[in-house]
């Protein structure tokens, strides 16, 4: 049976496999019931993509439409059809000067940038206050306290960016412009306001056609009421000495959401909540998205980066997972806050392909590591029980990896082409919150990205080549 026939057969069986897998999963994680019935279940039909995606290991490059360069040459922005490619030069300017150059060049490239981003920022702020009246004094105190914790060079860059962007405007005011404090706030959305959901998969050389690792990271984020984030995708190259970081994210943001350095250390953030929730603490805390940036600038291998970030986890504002890979190793940093650890709810641990998983979780493929929005190591906080979204995605990833067997880049692309995206009946891996999917092929160094355009991701996403981590 060829791979295409196997895929079609597997797709027809997915609803049955996932249902059986989830029922088994639930019975392991929670209190077993005497029987399982179909009472209350609603038949929703097939949610699978029946069309073969026709992927290959090669992704096309887009052509530059227009480019913009700052007066002093510290920032260059190339406009492509799907994204903006940004180059920031820290060799020939101070961090503050680079930040200023970025803001000014950005406004040339996207004159209505403030009209795009400011409404999105306030949607996140309103989400933070969850319907309550917004206390702007409290918000500003939170932001300025966290900003003060950021390493000086990054802080200077943020402030340079905010100074140039604001052009003298101050205070929180929803007016279609970005003031100084708003431009500071936008740089700390994951640390101060909070992201949503993500997932990741990495497969080692023993199960790839080339014998080299392939890593995937799917970012799920709030797109904005008008899908603002899909209008300003970016790939930013931060050049400092002999080190270059490539950050796949949002135009204008300086934090690290999905990023890789020129040694191939690849890091992606994934949110993790605390069971029954806990009070948010920001005093004495650090911004983990900027500590990731420091790790990428400092370490040339995934192990050292993972150990550094896991050791610091108690100092961060939110519980989270981190995908950390290089060509030889793969890790999930299960990073709880110190408050969660002290309450006995979680432990800081680095999960590998060989780690013992918590009771009830099944993963069938050695040399493959899957991450969703909960911890999975034995003895850590259980975010699976009662959370069908997490259970469903983990079970599906497990089945998809078994189906692929030996992976090519095309197979990894296909992980995100199994399910109909624009549906809300069944939790899916590739869903309507997807902002981008990034695949790193360690055999070539190529970085393949599918950027969401419009209201939601395509059922069969189109990947483009945005660069090579070994090229500067």
Which stretches of residues belong to each language-model region?
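Short intrinsically disordered, low-complexity coil segments enriched in acidic
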Residues: 2-3, 437
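Bacterial N-terminal signal peptides that target proteins for export
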Residues: 3-17
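C-terminus-biased signal that marks the final domain/tail of proteins
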Residues: 29, 36-197, 296-472
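A compositionally biased, intrinsically disordered/low-complexity signal enriched
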Residues: 4, 31-36, 213
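Internal mixed beta-strand/loop scaffold within catalytic domains of large alpha/beta enzymes
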Residues: 183-286, 290-291, 448-449
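Generic signal for short, ordered secondary-structure residues
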Residues: 8, 136-140, 284
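Bacterial N-terminal signal peptides
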Residues: 16-25
């Amino acid at each position: 049976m060829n791979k295409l026939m196997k895929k079609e057969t597997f797709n027809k069986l997915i609803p049955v496999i996932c249902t059986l897998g989830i029922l088994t999963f639930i019975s392991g994680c929670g209190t077993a019931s005497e029987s399982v019935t179909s009472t209350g279940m609603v038949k929703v039909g097939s949610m699978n993509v029946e069309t073969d995606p026709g992927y290959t290991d090669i992704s096309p490059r887009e052509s530059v439409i227009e480019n913009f360069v700052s007066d002093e040459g510290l920032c260059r922005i190339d406009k492509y059809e799907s994204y903006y490619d940004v180059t920031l030069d820290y060799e020939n300017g101070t961090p503050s000067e680079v930040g200023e150059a970025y803001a000014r060049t950005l406004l040339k490239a996207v004159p209505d940038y403030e009209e795009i981003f400011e409404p999105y920022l306030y949607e996140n702020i309103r989400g933070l206050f969850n319907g309550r009246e917004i206390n702007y004094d409290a918000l500003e105190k939170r932001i300025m306290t966290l900003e003060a914790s950021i390493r000086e060079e990054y802080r200077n860059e943020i402030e340079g960016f905010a100074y140039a962007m604001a052009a003298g405007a101050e205070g929180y005011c929803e007016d279609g412009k970005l003031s100084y404090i708003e431009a500071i706030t936008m740089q700390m959305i994951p640390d101060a306001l909070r992201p949503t959901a993500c997932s990741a998969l990495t497969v080692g050389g023993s199960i790839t056609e080339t014998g080299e690792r392939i890593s995937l990271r799917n970012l799920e984020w709030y797109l904005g009421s008008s899908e603002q984030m899909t209008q300003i995708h970016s790939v930013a190259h931060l050049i400092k000495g002999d080190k270059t970081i490539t950050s796949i994210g949002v135009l204008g943001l300086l934090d690290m959401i999905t990023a890789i350095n020129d040694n191939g250390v690849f890091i992606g953030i994934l949110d993790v909540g605390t069971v029954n929730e806990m009070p948010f603490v920001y005093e004495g805390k650090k911004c983990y998205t900027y500590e990731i940036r420091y790790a990428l600038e400092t370490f040339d291998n995934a192990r050292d980066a993972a150990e550094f970030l896991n050791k610091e986890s108690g100092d961060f504002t939110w519980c989270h997972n981190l995908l950390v890979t290089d060509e030889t190793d793969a890790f999930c940093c299960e990073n709880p806050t110190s408050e969660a650890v002290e309450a006995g709810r979680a432990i800081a641990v680095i999960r590998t392909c060989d780690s013992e998983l918590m009771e009830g979780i099944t993963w069938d493929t050695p040399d493959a590591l899957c991450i969703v929005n909960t911890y999975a190591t034995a003895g850590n906080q259980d975010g699976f029980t009662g959370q069908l979204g997490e259970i469903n995605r983990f079970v599906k990833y497990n089945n998809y990896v078994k189906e692929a067997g030996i992976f090519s880049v095309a197979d990894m692309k296909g992980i995100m082409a199994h399910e109909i995206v624009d549906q809300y009946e069944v939790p899916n891996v590739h869903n309507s919150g997807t902002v981008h999917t990034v695949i790193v092929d360690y055999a070539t160094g190529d970085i393949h990205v599918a950027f969401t355009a419009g209201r939601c991701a395509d059922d069969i996403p189109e990947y483009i080549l945005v660069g090579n981590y070994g090229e500067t």
